[in-house]
């Protein structure tokens, strides 16, 4: 599973924000600020392409009336405020994986930016801030790539790290020289982070229509108006795609995709993805497109020796969820512990309505907080929950989990598996 995750193409749906000082700095000219940000995005894209990550700019916001947070010269305070604003305001308006604030303010000391280590896909911590510290947009783009690198699990380079001649992107200090490469250490950090955490949001490919930056032929991503994109003409080796126009060559039906072979659609019924497990199904080509549509067993089909029911292609059971939260020795707590879910507080509730925690009804107690027994020498408490104020949903029983014979959790209720849920 880890190898399949590592090999999968990754996509970071990026949202860029420019603050009010940026707007003033560029003469209150929205087009100038926008162009600056598009230019920066066009530098970030090829940097991450080398890491098998496509960065797609899915949102851009310029604070042209007033700042939506108090931007200040203390970088850590500003990052904290920006991350909270993203979590509570921006995410509810626009789906994205990572947000970066570009500011015209001068941060204290030598700091040009700040980002949370390993924050990608986290509601609270997938964010960074960067000072617009140079007229040369390449250098500012590299600073954003650096903070995104932190979010993607990369630490600062040590003296022994190398990427060729120049200092690399994750160097601890700013350089006047532009470096477009990650070091061997950064690549190792990133790979280890991916294996350990397997962040899911970056597996989802954005739609062409999600991208807000003007289409650029040669950036490896098929955008509106393009049929294919195999990168710059000097490096493209794709026989199906004309790199200069991003159009299919004469006679070609397709250039990429699991149902494309030698520029032609694979025949209808050709298997394009094997079934991963008992809740999945083998996927087949239609003969009319390159898409390999993911199909899975119907929700409610018994799985894992009748310990669970299939739900959206997975088999969620409490035992696995306890192990994921508390480690390999953990088991599900006794039924009595789940009665805490009738309290309607941080430690026990079934769902939230307008941020109010709703207590579980007696029949729904196994669809609220998950209670586990860690079974470790230092923790003999029989009723444990995982609780984090920054991510309250983590530690709740997952949707689709079996809560009784013939029943599964849906919206904090234990419902019959034969009803749609």
UniProtKB/Swiss-Prot annotation:
Q: Where does Zn(2+) bind?
A: 146, 150, 156
User: Can you quote a single GO CC term?
Assistant: plasma membrane
Q: List the InterPro entries hit by this protein, alphabetically.
A: ADAM_Cys-rich (IPR006586), Disintegrin_CS (IPR018358), Disintegrin_dom (IPR001762), Disintegrin_dom_sf (IPR036436), MetalloPept_cat_dom_sf (IPR024079), Peptidase_M12B (IPR001590), Reprolysin_adamalysin (IPR034027)
According to its UniProt record, which cofactors does this protein need?
A: Zn(2+)
Intervals of motif D/ECD-tripeptide = 278-280
Active site: which residues? Answer: 147
Offer an example of a GO molecular function term for this protein. Answer: metal ion binding
- Which residue intervals define the domain Disintegrin in the entry? 214-299
One GO BP annotation of this record:
apoptotic process
Subcellular localization is given as: Secreted
The catalytic activity of this protein is classed by the Enzyme Commission as 3.4.24.-
The UniProt entry, under PROSITE patterns, shows: ADAM_MEPRO, DISINTEGRIN_1, DISINTEGRIN_2, ZINC_PROTEASE
**Tissue and organ expression note:** Expressed by the venom gland.
- Similarity comment: Belongs to the venom metalloproteinase (M12B) family. P-III subfamily. P-IIIc sub-subfamily.
Q: How does it assemble?
A: Homodimer; disulfide-linked.
Query: What protein name applies here?
Result: Zinc metalloproteinase-disintegrin-like crotastatin
Which organism is this entry from? Crotalus durissus terrificus (South American rattlesnake)
């Amino acid at each position: 599973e880890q190898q399949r995750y590592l090999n999968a193409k990754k996509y970071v749906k990026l949202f860029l924000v420019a603050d009010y000082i940026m707007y003033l700095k560029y003469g209150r000219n929205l087009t100038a600020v926008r162009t600056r940000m598009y230019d920066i995005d066009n530098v970030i894209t090829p940097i991450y392409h080398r890491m098998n990550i496509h960065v797609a700019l899915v949102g851009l916001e310029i604070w042209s009336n007033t700042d939506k947070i108090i931007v200040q010269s203390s970088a850590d305070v500003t990052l904290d405020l920006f991350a909270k604003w993203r979590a509570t305001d921006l995410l509810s308006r626009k789906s994205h994986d990572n947000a970066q604030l570009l500011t015209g303010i001068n941060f204290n000391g030598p700091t040009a930016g700040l980002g949370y280590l390993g924050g990608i896909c986290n509601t609270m911590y997938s964010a960074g801030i960067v000072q617009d510290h140079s007229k040369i947009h390449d250098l500012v783009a590299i600073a954003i790539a650096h903070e995104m690198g932190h979010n993607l699990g990369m630490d600062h380079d040590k003296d022994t790290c190398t990427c060729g001649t120049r200092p690399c992107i994750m160097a601890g200090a700013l350089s006047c020289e532009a470096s477009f490469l990650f070091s061997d250490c950064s690549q190792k950090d990133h790979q280890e982070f991916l294996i350990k955490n397997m962040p899911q949001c970056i597996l989802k490919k954005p739609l062409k229509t999600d991208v807000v930056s003007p289409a650029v032929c040669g950036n490896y991503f098929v955008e509106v108006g393009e049929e294919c994109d195999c990168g710059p003409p000097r490096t493209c080796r794709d026989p199906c795609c004309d790199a200069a126009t991003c159009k299919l060559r004469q006679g070609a039906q397709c250039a990429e995709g699991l149902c494309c072979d030698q520029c032609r659609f694979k025949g209808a019924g050709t298997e394009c993805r094997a079934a991963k497990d008992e809740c999945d199904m083998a996927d087949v080509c239609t003969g009319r497109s390159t898409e390999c549509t993911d199909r899975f067993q119907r929700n409610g089909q018994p799985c894992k020796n009748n310990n669970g029911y299939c739900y959206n292609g997975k088999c969620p059971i409490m035992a696995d969820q306890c192990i994921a939260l508390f480690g390999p020795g953990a088991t599900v707590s006794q039924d009595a512990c789940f009665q805490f879910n009738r309290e309607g507080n941080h430690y026990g509730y079934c769902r939230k309505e307008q941020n109010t925690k709703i207590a579980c009804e007696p029949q729904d107690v196994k669809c609220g907080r998950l209670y586990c027994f860690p079974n470790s020498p230092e923790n003999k408490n029989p009723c444990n929950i995982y609780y984090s104020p920054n991510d309250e949903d983590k530690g709740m029983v997952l949707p689709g989990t079996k809560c009784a014979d013939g029943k599964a959790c849906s919206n904090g209720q234990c419902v019959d598996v034969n009803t749609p849920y």
